[in-house]
Amino acid sequence: MKLSQLSILFILLFIHSFVQANPLKVGSWMGNLNLQNTHELFFQFEVDPNQKITIKNGGEIVEMKDYQIENDSIKVYFTNFPNYLIFKVDPLNENKLSGYFVNPDRKKHSRIEFKAFFYDDTPVIDIRYKHENFDGKWQVTFNPNTEDQYPAIGKFEQVNNKITGTFLTETGDYRFLKGTVINNELWLTSFDGAHVFLFTAHLINDTLRGEFLSGNHWKTDWIGVRNDDFTLKDPDSLTYMVKDDFKFQFKNLNGQNYVYPNQQLKGKVVIVQILGTWCPNCLDETKFYNELYDQFHNDGLEIIGVAYESPENFEDQVERIQRYIDNKSVPYPILVGGRASKTITSKDFDMLNKVSSFPTSIFINKDGEVVKIHTGFNGPGTGEIYEEYKIETIQMINRLLIE
């Protein structure tokens, strides 16, 4: 028995020392997430000489924190979210990794099987097939022919058999997508540390028909047809006031009550941002609001965030919000709204018809009047649509400040 215990201890020490003595191989890796045991989502990541890991997610680079050794495994947290990868290096092959992507906030389907292999990052153009052209604007319906169907715009750019783009919905975009085309088949993916999205489709008689998978917990059908004239509802029209007064009270990160309106904001232009630190679209909006604040704060612009978080208790909610503020150098205050729930948020902001999206922003003039409510956020993944929105918002803030 003693010999057996010593043998086990020796093996564990050997594996632990192997992980410590053999850092991740520097260079390009191909990751693979097993979705619902039916599909695979591939993504690229890099390991630099300092062992920093960055994921290539379409048009953005997703940073990860320095990894830590946990027993015989390596655990790496995403910078912007509480999610992480935990994996082992194959002791017989340093070019292979295996483990899981974990979302600790999910009570069900919190783990997705993860594998990776080291590879030569040389672009390959597949010339074996005659590829269909998916470039352009598509009118899309998710959950078609059901009570839950909703419209979207597919916006794609294709070069040879490589494709990038996004889907815009009435509550925001699906951010940076990239993928591959083979014959009449389309694959688009996103893995940004929060979203785990896979879109597949076949082009049949000018119609796209496919599936949309989100992690291990959700799957739906979608269809699309080309339509350059198709538009979604105006995001400034979806949320509106149903009571005269816009007011609220929440606790700040120190547990003190914060009441709006207040004397300090009298005569100021104010943006109230309803968000969650778990929300990638909210992060896109926060980055833009950081720019707005830096540009216009001295002229009289104030921004107040109200965050709704996944943890149930106040202390953990504060920790999430404080980490978000620190990581992104957010210059404006963010209050604690409570649990992440559109029902709870709609009850807290009962002067609105509803809160249908994180984020939602309320724009208020110097007289304390709500002049605009913007639902959702179409971020940098939408290209010129995002740039146009930035210009429009800056022009509006300028106008409100001089009125």
Please report, for each region that a protein language model flagged, where it lies by residue:
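Short active-site neighborhood of thiol/selenol oxidoreductases, capturing the structured segment around
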Residues: Y258-L283, Y289
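N-terminal "domain-start" segment that seeds a small globular fold
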Residues: R226-N262
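Bacterial Sec-dependent N-terminal signal peptides
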Residues: M1-S28
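N-terminal helix-cap/turn-to-beta initiation motif at the start of protein domains
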Residues: V19-M30, F117-Q139, Q158, D236-V242
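Structural micro-motif
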Residues: S329-P333, L352-I362
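Structural microenvironment flanking redox-active thiols in thiol-disulfide oxidoreductases
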Residues: D284-S329, S341-D348
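Central antiparallel beta-sheet cores of small beta-barrel/beta-sandwich binding domains
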Residues: M30-D90, V124-I125, E132-T200
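Thiol-/selenol-based redox modules, centered on thioredoxin-like
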Residues: S357-E403
